[in-house]
Amino acid sequence: MADADIRNDIYVLALENAVKHKAVPRAGAILGSVMGAHPELRSKAKEINALIPEILEEVAALSIEEREEKLMSLNPGAIEKMHEKKERSHELPDLPNAESGVVMRFAPNPSGPLHLGHARASVLNDYYVKKYGGKFYYRVEDTDPKRVDPSAYEMVSEDLAWLGIGITDVVYQSDRFAIYYEYARKLLELGGAYMCTCDNNEFREKKLKKIACPCREISVEENLKRFDDMLAGKYAEGEITLRVKTDIAHPDPAVRDFAAMRVLTSTPHPRKPAIFVYPLMNFSVAVDDHLLGMTHVIRGKDHIANTRRQEYIYNYFGWKMPYFYHYGRMSIAGLELSTSGMRKGINEGLYTGWDDIHLGTLRALARRGIQPEAVRAATIDIGMGDTDISFSWENLFAQNKAVIDAGADRYFFVPDAVEVEIAGAPKTEAHAPVYPNQPERGERVLPFTGRVLLPKSEMEKGGMLRLKDLFNINITGPNSAEYAGDSLAEARSQKAAIVQWLPTETAAPCSLLTPEGIQEGFSEPAVLGYLGRIVQFERVGFSKIDAVNDGKVIAYFTHR
């Protein structure tokens, strides 16, 4: 095997390792890979080991994007294998008793738009309906008017459509009050519930002491009279509650004689303003899950206590329970997820709206350039395990990159730019591909006439810089430099940073909005024509062009 071939193999193996792990590998790891791939070279291990540090320096000098581009040109099969491995991971375990089809539901409260936590519930249920066939209900759980934002009805529907959720039926619980009253009456007749007129605080104290409420022992006839009086408006808010009889000594106090229906007059319902008797979640959910024929319910383990409550209702009516699966909690660092917290921040001007990039809503992710396919893939990768986990932004970004990379044309963005005059350089122009290794997509031509825009942070370092796709310069002052030849090999030997640059005459002002703040700078003028599309700013990352105002680009940073 020739020395040049050995060096090329080492370079490719180093690139594969760096792309896979998003970091420059250790020399020992590369030596082991070389020996594993070419056992006949073990006698040359010493010479090969001496080559590795120099090659790793070359790999380290490349950006993440450049490493992938190099690897794609040298060994496209390696990238394909990485993607195949990801695809194989996008599977979930089989559900029991699902072979003949399933009936499942996504049932949010319309208090605001959907966020990443909602995405998990909707995607997991949608996955199984698409796998087995059947019905998928979008059930709007809007029986608590205090938690209903009228604008959320439309926002949630839009979010589900964006996410590609295959809803087959839509049900509004606020259209079903008569059904809940009917089953509340039946439950009273069965002796499975009672109408409690005790003070709520007194009831809570008794419950914690495992002492039954006196109302628990009243007759069915008296319960039905109180129920009719409640529906007739003879009780004020807080004066009466329908409670389900459970075990007053149950180990979980939340399960003991839980509330199922109440009077609420202080907040009118936006869809049903005449209603004042409202079922609580556990009652309406149990009734609807049965009547709509749910076969499987997949939700977070914070609902385990609710499942225990609902089981009492199922048992009183003699209904068959669905199969319940409770997945672990998922913490999401770095973004606001609380609907009340988001609304407060919007009202106070802290956030620009529900799609502010500091929020974890799906519409905020979409505005940044995150694709629904990536959210789905990342969610399925997380799976349904009952162990609590932390959401992986790295995985979401990797999934998103796999979706957007092929369509993202490459351009320069110069942050915090300074104008630099370069002495001694020939008047020339740079030719850069719109997309690596695809000449049919065209090229960008950047003319050089003596003055360029460069990142201030790079100018402050001094020394030699390599202007990408152009030539080398030596920095001579805050706004000056001199031509230092065209040799890329010389730039590498001097460990010169490869930097993006722009001609001063044609650069377009550009604001790049990131979660950390706004980066002011300049982009290539062609970016003005990419409104609503995603580009990759070389050595910066993917960005979605959000607006173009009077020749200025407003872009949202997606990820690297």
Swiss-Prot record:
- Per its UniProt record, what InterPro entries does this chain match? aa-tRNA-synth_I_CS, Gln/Glu-tRNA_Ligase, Glu-tRNA-synth_arc/euk, Glu/Gln-tRNA-synth, Glu/Gln-tRNA-synth_Ib_cat-dom, Glu/Gln-tRNA-synth_Ib_codon-bd, Rbsml_bL25/Gln-tRNA_synth_N, Ribosomal_bL25/Gln-tRNA_synth
- Please, which domain of life does this record's source organism belong to? Archaea
Does Ion transport count among this protein's keywords? no
The EC number(s) given in the record are 6.1.1.17
Motif range for 'HIGH' region?
Answer: 108-118
Cellular component GO terms, alphabetical: cytosol; protein-containing complex
Keyword set, alphabetical order: Aminoacyl-tRNA synthetase, ATP-binding, Cytoplasm, Ligase, Nucleotide-binding, Protein biosynthesis
Which Pfam families does the record associate with it? tRNA-synt_1c (PF00749), tRNA-synt_1c_C (PF03950), tRNA-synt_1c_C2 (PF20974)
GO molecular-function terms, A-Z? ATP binding; glutamate-tRNA ligase activity
Question: Which Gene3D superfamilies does UniProt cross-reference here?
Answer: 2.40.240.100, HUPs, Ribosomal Protein L25, Chain P
Q: Does the keyword Protein transport apply?
A: no
Give compartment(s).
Cytoplasm
Annotated catalysed reactions? tRNA(Glu) + L-glutamate + ATP = L-glutamyl-tRNA(Glu) + AMP + diphosphate
Tell me the PROSITE patterns matching this sequence: AA_TRNA_LIGASE_I
What biological processes does GO assign it? amide biosynthetic process; glutamyl-tRNA aminoacylation
Q: What is the documented function of this protein?
A: Catalyzes the attachment of glutamate to tRNA(Glu) in a two-step reaction: glutamate is first activated by ATP to form Glu-AMP and then transferred to the acceptor end of tRNA(Glu).
Family affiliation? Belongs to the class-I aminoacyl-tRNA synthetase family. Glutamate--tRNA ligase type 2 subfamily.
What the entry lists under PANTHER family is as follows: GLUTAMATE--TRNA LIGASE, GLUTAMINE-TRNA LIGASE
* Protein name from the UniProt record: Glutamate--tRNA ligase
Q: Which gene encodes it?
A: gltX
